[in-house]
Amino acid sequence: LTWPAVAAGWSLAVEQGKIGMALPDIHTGGWAVTGSRADVVSSVNASGESAVIRFNPTSTVATERLAYTDLEQPLLLQDLRTNLSHVTLTLDYGASGTWAERLAMEGEVKIEASRIEHPLLVPQAWSFQGRVKGRLANLRVQGSLVSAAGLKASLDVQLYPDGAVAISVDSAIEGQAGIRALAETFTGWPELLTVDSGSAAVSAEVRMGPGGGLEASGSSNLEKVTGVFNRTAFSGLSGRVLASLEDDRLIAGFRDLTVEQVNPGIPVNAIRFTGDYTGPVANTLEGQLEVQQARAQFLEGALRIPPGVYDLEGSSGGIPVEVQDISLDRLMEVYPAEGLEGSGLLSGRIPIGFSGDGIQVAQGRLSAEAPGGRLRLPAEKLQAMLGGNQAMDVVVQALQNFHYSVLASTIDYDEKGKLTLDLRIEGKNPELRGGQPVVLNVNLEEDIPALLTSLQLSGRVNEAVTKRVRKLLQESGEEAVP
């Protein structure tokens, strides 16, 4: 059966309610739909201006290719199979306009794509089940989306006549299985991030304009997320993260973020953070961080960043971390050397700078709170730290049992991980020179990455980190395979 009123290129075959129909290619608003064919069982009610087709079971439309090419990151769907068993299609073949403006759909659909490609996605099959309503140029699609990796999400898509597209996605991610599905769906998942437990409710909205412009926003509500990133273990991460993309600038908000513990080798506990970030997508270090609240517990004391707006890169003062009453005794306990002892409380201020080369500290300062305390440093360890300088023997002797009233140090840290301490210590050793007052000026250096590696290998973080560090060292040839 041929309908003369239908645009050129259409052919319809009707036999006992069966229709085989080659559909024309559609090009509109950056979208391209090619290689489509309908094989349906239906009832047709036609008039001089339109036809209404009600599809029965086994009705399908196969599409070789659906693409959106007006973006720098194009979207491609291949080998789509759409089940129209419960859909009504209205063809206004007597109306003017494009086919996308003359075709309307309503009903329940099932869609399967053998492969979806996008720079942000791992290429794989996807399936969708939901409802469609509207003309193709102004279509609303709502339902459930599932990736071959197992990621499940609620999807809401609105197409507009000018070619714009609005997409809303919501997903609940639970435990290892949910995280594994997420990692196997998105290309940007960090290779060294492992999540063991917790949950996240994620939502995202994307709008692609007719001219190819992209606006995106999203949020994530985290609940007790625990895992390992690179060599650092974390536990109890909760809170809300907001993000939006506007004119190549990233805007992020962190609301009531809490972390029970972050442990790279020396644990930081009870972290609390609320703030906002704004910066260019191309170089996040050129952005600004507005801190509303930032505090944590560390070595029985506290760390705090004062509220304010800070430039991440190029700021002369860096981001100031205030250190309050950390325990020297606890610090000596976590240091990977036997025989270190100390007492007293340390406070000060450490400005942290960021660059493409890493983290730096310039002229940080720590000092002991009155009335001071006691230091005992083993001679062998101290001599090694001082480089075996025999001229420093008096320092080594004094620090075997030193009662200090003043302990102050500048702190510098470079991009390569070298920590430099310029210490000034005033006090006495009751067993040295009759307990005469002694003033010591000591310069110490420490390789912090090597120190943390030692702590991680000792099992002070957790077994997963120890195994990861050992594997990395073996791969780099720094540690022999046992």
Pin down the residues of each PLM region.
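Extended amphipathic, helix-rich lipid-handling scaffolds
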Residues: 1-228, 239-247, 251-354, 384-417, ...
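Outer-membrane beta-barrel and related beta-rich outer-membrane complex signature
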Residues: 373-382
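C-terminal structural cap/anchor segments
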Residues: 345-373
